[in-house]
A protein has these predicted regions:
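A short helix-loop-beta-strand connector motif used in the catalytic cores of GNAT acetyltransferases and
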Residues: 41-54
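Conserved GNAT-fold acetyl-CoA-binding loop/helix
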Residues: 14-43
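Conserved beta-strand-loop-alpha-helix junction that forms the acyl-donor binding cleft
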Residues: 89, 111-122, 138-142
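A short beta-loop-alpha structural element at the N-terminal edge
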Residues: 1-15
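Conserved GNAT acetyl-CoA-binding A-motif
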Residues: 98, 104-117
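Conserved beta-strand in the GNAT
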Residues: 54, 62-71, 78-83
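Conserved acetyl-CoA pyrophosphate-binding loop and the N-cap/start of the following alpha-helix
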Residues: 88, 92-100
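Conserved acetyl-CoA binding element of GNAT-fold acetyltransferases
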Residues: 75-86, 113, 145
Length: 151
C-alpha cells in the first residue's frame, strides 16, 4: 500500500535509502554518493518542504519497502529518491511509486535525474513518459541525465 509518510517514518526511510542506494554506488564504483551520506536532520528538512510517500508491505509487518519524495521548486516538481528495497524490486513497485507521486502534482512539469549508467532507471522513466532534456558531466566517470514530463 502506498500512502503519505509521517515524520516518525523518516528514520526507517533513511535506513531504506542507505540500503537501496548501495546498488547505485556499486554501479558507479563510488560509495561517496549523497544518498549514502545524507543525515536524518537533512531528511527531516526535506520532509518539511516536500511530499514523501511510502510503500508498506502488509505481509511483512507493515515494513517500509519503498519510498519517493518530491518538492515544487523553480516552477517544476523535482522528484527524487525513488527507491525500493532490493528484495522487493522487479515487481512494479518503482512504477507504482512514480505514478503515485505524479498524482500529487497533476498538471505540473516534473523533473528528475539519474546517472547515465543507471540504464534500468532510464528505461523506467522513459516508459513512464519522461524524456531527456539535458545531460550534465559531473566528472569524467560520472554523467547525469535530466528528464522531464508534463503531467
Amino acid at each position: 500500500m502506498i500512502c503519505h509518510a509521517e515524520a516518525e517514518d523518516l528514520p526507517a526511510i533513511l535506513e531504506l535509502q542507505y540500503l537501496a542506494y548501495r546498488t547505485e554506488a556499486e554501479l558507479l564504483g563510488n560509495w561517496d554518493i549523497p544518498p549514502l551520506k545524507q543525515k536524518l536532520s537533512e531528511v527531516e528538512e526535506e520532509f518539511r518542504t516536500g511530499v514523501f510517500l511510502k510503500l508498506i508491505s502488509e505481509n511483512d509487518g507493515d515494513a517500509i519497502v519503498g519510498s519517493v519524495r518530491a518538492v515544487e521548486k523553480d516552477g517544476a516538481v523535482q522528484i527524487g529518491k525513488l527507491m525500493v528495497h532490493p528484495q522487493f524490486r522487479r515487481r512494479g513497485y518503482g512504477r507504482m511509486l512514480l505514478s503515485a507521486i505524479e498524482a500529487e502534482f497533476a498538471g505540473k512539469r516534473c523533473v528528475l535525474f539519474t546517472s547515465t549508467r543507471s540504464v534500468n532507471n532510464i528505461r523506467l522513466y522513459e516508459s513512464a513518459g519522461y524524456r531527456i532534456f539535458e545531460t550534465r558531466t559531473i566528472s569524467p566517470e560520472l554523467k547525469f541525465v535530466y528528464m522531464e514530463k508534463q503531467l
